[in-house]
């Protein structure tokens, strides 16, 4: 099929690779503009742009599509279908209605749950047992279109957002490629979303990543998994931030939150249960295991962290 692809980050790049491998004709690629990255602010192309250029596909990087400035170009490209994966720009009706088969979007949640920019992370943060991928027919709303296909997958209780994202990326690319022939054949039955059951998955930030030892052990465990690899969950002790990259929730005997129960591994009481701080990054220091962190603070059982 003749496809115009729109996407920006790694998950979009993997989907674009899969579309090339499946033999589709990619007539053009829209992505966000190159941006400065890292401490040296090196101007860096989006992953999707790199994949497109490797295949000799024309790349377009407009600031917006909403002003109609790209309508003529999109019409000239004459796509049968527009595929959108984490593009980052809103598509106006003129674009949505341009292709024969309209526009479809890959969303990495079981819609209508977790509409928005961070569905994988919020599934982990909330301790969900399952998530999945959805292919929807796009409309003018935010992840509100009719669902064409969805596929469920289990979330492991120790899985981080990064690990889960790798799995949903692979599943999403596969399901996307399986869906397109069904669109061409007209065999899919779009299912309207139940908007009353919709939930949102807003973007994460560093402040949101904070937890307290007065939280439950289950909450802390989910927060540490869900905020990994970015922005990393953290708490404050002695006036300094400590990031936690790996932990384990365990039982306690009802000790006061913050009480050190053991140092090998470092185990601290919470509001409900206890948490083993397996790997941490103290502010201004290198990553270390929890036992080394406890030794540096000369902690012993019975102390308060």
Task: Report each predicted region and the residues it spans.
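N-terminal Rossmann-like dinucleotide-binding module
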Residues: 1-39
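Internal alpha/beta domain cores that form substrate/cofactor-binding pockets in large enzymes
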Residues: 2-4, 25-29, 55-77, 82, ...
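A residue-level signal for conserved active-site and pocket-lining positions in enzyme catalytic cores
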Residues: 7, 29, 52, 82, ...
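Structural motif corresponding to alpha-helix initiation and N-cap regions
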Residues: 13, 42-45, 67-71, 89, ...
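N-terminal beta-loop-helix "entrance" segment that forms/cooperates
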Residues: 35-55
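Active-site-lining helix/loop region of Rossmann-like oxidoreductase modules
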Residues: 178-236
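An anion-binding loop in the catalytic cleft
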Residues: 213-305
């Amino acid at each position: 099929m003749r496809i115009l692809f729109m996407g920006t980050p790694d998950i979009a790049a993997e989907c674009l690779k899969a579309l090339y491998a499946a033999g589709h004709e990619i007539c053009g690629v829209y992505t966000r503009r190159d941006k400065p990255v890292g401490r040296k602010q090196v101007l860096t192309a989006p992953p999707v742009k790199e994949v497109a250029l490797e295949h000799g596909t024309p790349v377009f990087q407009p600031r917006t599509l909403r002003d109609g400035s790209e309508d003529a170009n999109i019409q000239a490209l004459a796509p049968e279908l527009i595929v959108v994966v984490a593009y980052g720009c809103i598509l106006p009706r003129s674009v949505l209605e341009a292709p024969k088969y309209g526009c479809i979007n890959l969303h990495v949640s079981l819609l209508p749950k977790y509409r928005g920019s961070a569905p994988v992370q919020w599934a982990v943060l909330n301790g969900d047992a399952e998530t999945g991928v959805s292919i929807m027919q796009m409309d003018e709303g935010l992840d509100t279109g009719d669902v064409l296909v969805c596929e469920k997958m289990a979330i492991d209780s120790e899985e981080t957002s990064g690990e889960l994202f790798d799995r949903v990326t692979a599943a999403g690319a596969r399901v996307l490629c399986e869906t397109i022939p069904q669109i061409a054949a007209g065999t899919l039955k779009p299912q309207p979303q139940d908007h009353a059951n919709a939930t949102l998955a807003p973007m994460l930030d560093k402040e949101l990543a904070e937890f307290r030892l007065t939280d439950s052990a289950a909450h802390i465990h989910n927060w540490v998994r869900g905020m990994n690899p970015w922005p990393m969950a953290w708490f404050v002790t002695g006036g300094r931030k400590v990031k936690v990259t790996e932990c384990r929730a365990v039982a306690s005997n009802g000790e006061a939150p913050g009480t050190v129960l053991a140092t090998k591994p470092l185990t601290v009481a919470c509001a409900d249960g206890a948490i083993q701080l397996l790997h941490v990054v103290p502010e201004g220091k290198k990553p270390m295991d929890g036992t080394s962190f406890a030794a540096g603070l000369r902690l012993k059982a019975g102390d308060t962290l």
